[in-house]
UniProtKB/Swiss-Prot annotation:
One of the protein's GO biological processes: secondary metabolite biosynthetic process
Protein name per its UniProtKB record: Short-chain dehydrogenase fogB
Protein encoded by which gene: fogB
PANTHER family reported for this sequence: DEHYDROGENASES, SHORT CHAIN (PTHR24321), SHORT-CHAIN DEHYDROGENASE_REDUCTASE FAMILY, PUTATIVE (AFU_ORTHOLOGUE AFUA_5G14340)-RELATED (PTHR24321:SF12)
Gene3D superfamilies documented for this protein: NAD(P)-binding Rossmann-like Domain
Keyword hit for Disulfide bond: no
Source organism of the structure: Aspergillus ruber (strain CBS 135680)
């Protein structure tokens, strides 16, 4: 019950998205399409995937996408379907993080909208376009080894956050946008379940990525706060989040849809402030 189909990784140019693209390549995907706002990074990660893949028949491509633009998302999705034939797995990792903390009493509306545009509307656009593409393709057996698992047209995994379920001080726009991702994922799962499409999200806490490093530099006291609330005593490495994504995409989670899979080192077991 391994990864065998085609993967579309949005936001795959770095951080968690890059780790997911590389994981699909090493876990046996047939083709990996790496999409990113930075086309050069997408092509570079695709080349890394090509080098790591165990199969000589594996292919990887880089695609440019701007998830805040409806036409760009539609065009990129259509391009991937045309090149790959179908999308079996979609991982939506594109997003922005807080670079400077702000209290509710002083947060500018433009900054709040900026987070919603990328983290929420962008997630919606990708989920919508990929849902439509998956509905148009033929169903396949989830697993030839376990035929009672039925058929599938695909699996979508969105990147949410531990801040989809709790809150932390000074980062209202991020928290609100990620709460919306969890709701979007649950409703998309309901809408898609009769079409044989599963939709889940991964909810990590802090991960060692450039986004978190920028947040630590811009939000006073965040580094100490993170250390105080993560029982495991460290932030995650991107590969640990990619492992959870691969599980939710693979046949091993064939009875899981609409879930917010928390991967947080125990963070939500403690008070967040």
């Amino acid at each position: 019950m391994d990864i065998t189909g085609n993967a579309f990784v949005v936001g795959g140019g770095g951080g968690i998205g890059k780790a997911c693209a590389l994981a699909f390549a090493t876990e046996g995907a047939t083709v990996v399409a790496v999409a990113d706002l930075d086309a050069k990074k997408a092509v570079e990660v695709a080349a890394e995937c090509q080098a790591l893949a165990p199969s000589a028949e594996f292919r990887a491509i880089g695609v440019q996408i701007d998830i805040t633009q409806e036409d760009s998302v539609r065009s990129a999705t259509e391009q991937v379907v045309q090149l790959l034939g179908r999308i079996d797995y979609c991982v939506n990792c594109a997003g922005i993080g807080v670079q400077q903390g702000a209290d509710i009493a002083t947060l500018p509306l433009a900054e709040f909208r900026r987070f919603l545009d990328v983290n929420t509307i962008g997630m919606f656009l990708v989920t919508r376009e990929v849902s439509a593409a998956m509905r148009a393709q033929e169903p396949r057996l989830v697993s030839s080894e376990s035929p009672r698992r039925g058929t599938t047209r695909g699996a979508i995994v969105n990147l949410a956050s531990v801040l989809s379920v709790v809150a932390a001080p000074g980062i209202i726009p991020y928290t609100a946008s990620k709460h919306a991702v969890l709701g979007l994922t649950k409703n998309a799962a309901l809408d898609n379940v009769s079409h044989g499409i599963r939709v889940n999200c991964v909810c990590p806490s802090w991960v060692d990525t450039p986004m978190v490093q920028q947040a630590e530099e811009g939000v006073q006291g965040l580094t100490q706060f993170i250390k105080s609330v993560v029982p495991m005593g460290r932030i995650a490495v991107p590969e640990e989040i990619a492992d959870a994504v691969i599980f939710l995409a693979s046949p091993r989670s064939s009875y899981v849809t609409g879930s917010g899979f928390i991967v947080d080192g125990g963070t939500t077991l403690t008070a967040m402030s």
